[in-house]
Design a protein with these regions (language model features):
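Alpha-amylase-like alpha-glycosidases and glucanotransferases acting on alpha-linked glucans and related
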Residues: 91, 234-384, 410-658, 662-664, ...
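Long, contiguous interaction/targeting segments characteristic
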Residues: 1-65
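Structured C-terminal cap/extension of enzyme domains
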Residues: 666-717
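Acidic/aromatic-lined carbohydrate-recognition and catalytic surfaces
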Residues: 43-103, 107-144, 153, 163-420
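Residue-level detector of anion-binding/catalytic polar loops
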Residues: 19, 221, 400-402, 476, ...
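Short, exposed coil/turn segments at beta-strand boundaries within extracellular/luminal domains
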Residues: 149, 154-159
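Short helix/loop capping segments that flank catalytic or ligand/cofactor-binding pockets
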Residues: 23, 174-175, 197, 412-413, ...
């Protein structure tokens, strides 16, 4: 296809991973708008607003690698040798070595220069250093000692250094999943919505432990929980767990106050006040929608009292060890939360001297407000302690994985990460998705993307720290929109989602680092790979040992009659479920509640009756498939239909199966309606029973129907 774009602009964009064309979900070839390409290049720090800038940027693109002695970072797989380019003035003597993360040193072989080029008036030679495939896994450094001649000795100070990451060739499955036909199962929950009579109006980590213990008693291997990332530290709190302020730290609303050891130090009057806050929160349990702000106001007051009690010598040492381990990232987050309380939620509107986390003004404020900063650090320590306790308890109850955390695709555009990580996150663009069959106008998620160039310059440290935090005390990790490790749809600010373009990432580095950290954590990784995906990507992830995601409603036999994909045809390396949080609970889906809801919100693309007829025909085809397989009797009610769908899924080849707590409760209400904001109470709907009445965990655990559905997934029913 002939492009109308200037050839130099196409070359520049291609060199920086910016797509100038793509294929849409209907198989149509699309050319990206020229203005979009220039804006996205600008967001990557590449001047491209006119032909002169494009020409200059192209020259820089061609010459910059020759100006750099070593690449910014290199990520390789264990067992594969790699030739590392080195650029030095012609005739320069040097010695290359790898300094291993355990402080060991290995000398490296290198070739003499075979290619020379003149750059900035100097003749530069390109040489190659051989990285052997025998290097151990880990975070190492390649060091060059220039002018060393043939001298040996590891004491020479390196002249140049580069981070080197060695990742496993493949992320191996846990032993219990390695055999042919081996399968595990677990429950999936939105923790905030799943309450008990002991929680303070929203679900907490003690509730998570109780759910896990109950499920473990039925043979479950994991509990998949929504992203627990931190939201705003003061009202109003963003309800979506997929729009956090940071992905490295967690939301203290999930703390169970009574389980903090220092509660024992409270005076009788203080303990009575904590009990009053707990009792007051009970009034939120019977409401139709969750009241996060009110819940957090009471919980924060109680936690502040506990914080001010001080700690034992042992606990104080543990607290400071946590602060030291988390480093500058924790201090930055705590400082941001403190300034937030003073100057409001958008750091871009703070006094100018406070917009830079490394400014003297920020350091002074940190000292002046040291108690508030320490309180925020303490909240994260308590969270980490309780999360570790949940994972420990679940493994002790017999779960083979335990908690599976969920990693959101991005962060709030003016939250903690955008303040503290600087230009590692792109400005003036947001992440979204092009049009597809479910969202024909495209999507804008209002989240700033990682800048691939800055991640590389930082040695992927911010990405690594985020992954490590998500994997700490976890048996598994779900990656929302795992395709974002390969490419993301960047949308210039002020434009429509369809006016964006794809920007590529170094997927070898992104996936390799994920594999290394998951290997070290002993965790399974599940990638949510729904939507528009390049055909080779799923194969790449599978070869890396990363599981995909299969949703029953989306798995159709397109080579047959268009009905359900037979369970024996499911891919093996996946987490298979009947539903997902962007669909209604299965009982609601079977009753068409999503059609009625979308109609009431004006989201249908065709008349209501036409939409209902098509939806009913699709569901009837599914139910007919179940009846033909002998899994469903004629005239069966909704509860039996839900059970039959899960029984069908249990015959699949998928390594992991999941059942939603909403399905265990026979809930029908939609958790999240894509395409809406204030029009629907997204992420504020509590767990309810079939009549729409909120249901507590204590009640759910007594339901025979819940146990029967869980056993259906485990093939025991």
């Amino acid at each position: 296809v002939t492009s109308a774009l200037p050839a130099p602009l196409i070359e520049l964009a291609s060199g920086h991973g910016v797509a100038t064309e793509f294929w849409d979900w209907q198989g149509n070839h699309r050319q990206v708008e020229e203005s979009t390409i220039r804006t996205v290049l600008g967001a990557l720090g590449i001047p491209a607003q006119d032909d002169d800038q494009v020409a200059a940027s192209l020259r820089a693109r061609r010459e910059d690698p020759w100006r750099r002695v070593l690449p910014t970072v290199t990520v390789i797989r264990s067992g594969r040798s790699h030739r590392l380019p080195v650029h030095l003035p012609v005739g320069t003597d040097f010695r290359a070595r790898v300094r291993l993360e355990d402080s060991g040193v290995l000398d490296l072989e290198h070739s003499r220069g075979a290619v020379n080029r003149e750059v900035d008036g100097a003749k530069i030679s390109e040489l190659e250093v051989l990285l052997p495939g025998s290097l151990p896994l880990g975070w190492h450094a390649v060091e060059l000692v220039v002018g060393a001649g043939e001298r040996k000795g590891n004491g020479d100070a390196p002249t140049h250094s580069m981070p080197l990451v060695v990742a496993p060739e493949k992320l191996e499955l846990p032993e219990f999943l390695r055999g042919d036909g081996d399968q595990g199962w677990g429950v999936m929950t939105q923790l905030y919505a799943m309450r008990s009579r002991q929680s303070w109006g929203t679900g907490d980590l003690a509730d998570l432990a109780d759910l896990g213990a109950w499920a473990a008693g039925l043979g479950a291997d994991f509990v998949l929980v929504n992203p627990l990332h931190a939201a705003e530290p003061h009202p109003p709190m963003e309800p979506s767990p997929y729009l956090p302020t940071t992905r490295r730290f967690a939301n203290p609303i999930y703390i169970r106050v009574e389980d903090v050891p220092e509660v024992a130090y409270l005076s009788a009057a203080e303990r009575q006040l904590v009990e009053w806050h707990a009792d007051d929160a009970q009034r939120f349990l019977d409401l139709d929608f969750l009241e996060r702000d009110a819940v957090w106001a009471g919980k924060q007051s109680a936690l502040l009292m506990v914080f001010r009690q001080g700690r034992s010598v042992r606990r104080e040492r543990a607290f400071h060890a946590f602060i030291e381990r988390e480093g500058q990232g924790l201090v930055d987050y705590a400082t941001w939360a403190t300034i937030f309380a003073i100057h409001g939620p958008d750091w871009r509107e703070w006094p100018e001297e406070l917009r830079d986390p490394r400014s003297e003004a920020v350091e002074k404020l940190r000292q002046d407000r040291s108690e508030q900063v320490e309180f925020q650090c303490w909240l994260q320590w308590v969270l980490a302690d309780q999360l570790a306790g949940v994972q420990r308890d679940l493994r002790e109850t017999g779960m083979r994985l335990g908690v599976m955390h969920d990693l959101a695709v991005g962060v709030h555009p003016h939250g903690a990460d955008t303040w503290s990580l600087g230009d590692a996150l792109a400005r003036d663009v947001t992440v979204g998705a092009p049009a597809d069959q479910y969202n024909q106008l495209g999507q804008n998620w209002s989240q700033p993307p990682w800048r691939p160039d800055k991640l590389a310059e930082l040695g992927y440290a911010p990405y690594r720290d985020m992954i490590r935090a998500a994997l700490r005390d976890a048996g598994g990790l779900r990656i929302d929109h795992v395709i974002g490790l390969f490419r993301l749809w960047w949308i210039p600010e002020g434009t429509l989602p369809r006016e964006g373009t794809y920007v590529r990432y170094d997927h070898e580095a992104m996936v390799g680092i994920l594999m290394l950290e998951a290997h070290r954590a002993g965790a399974v990784v599940v990638g949510e790979d729904l939507g528009t995906v390049e055909p080779w990507v799923r194969d790449y992830l599978s070869e890396a040992g990363i599981l995909g995601t299969s949703i029953l409603w989306f798995e159709k036999d397109y080579d047959g009659d268009g009905g359900l994909l037979p369970p024996e045809s499911y891919r093996e390396l996946c987490l298979a479920t009947v539903t997902t949080h962007d669909l209604p609970p299965t009982a609601g889906y079977l009753q068409g509640v999503h059609i009625d809801l979308r109609h009431s919100l004006g989201l249908l693309n065709r008349p209501l009756e036409e939409e209902k007829a098509a939806d009913e025909a699709d569901r009837e085809q599914v139910l007919a498939d179940l009846r033909r397989r002998g899994l469903l009797r004629e005239g069966a009610g909704v509860a039996e239909q839900v059970e039959a769908l899960h029984r069908f899924l249990s015959f699949s080849r998928a390594k992991l199966l999941g059942v939603s707590v909403s399905d265990l409760a026979q809930d029908t209400r939609v958790i999240n309606q894509p395409g809406t904001d204030e029009e629907y109470p997204n992420w504020r709907v509590p767990l309810a029973g079939p009549e729409g009445r909120p249901v507590m965990l204590e009640e759910l655990f007594t339901w025979r129907s819940a146990r029967r559905l869980a056993r259906t997934v485990s093939r025991e029913a």
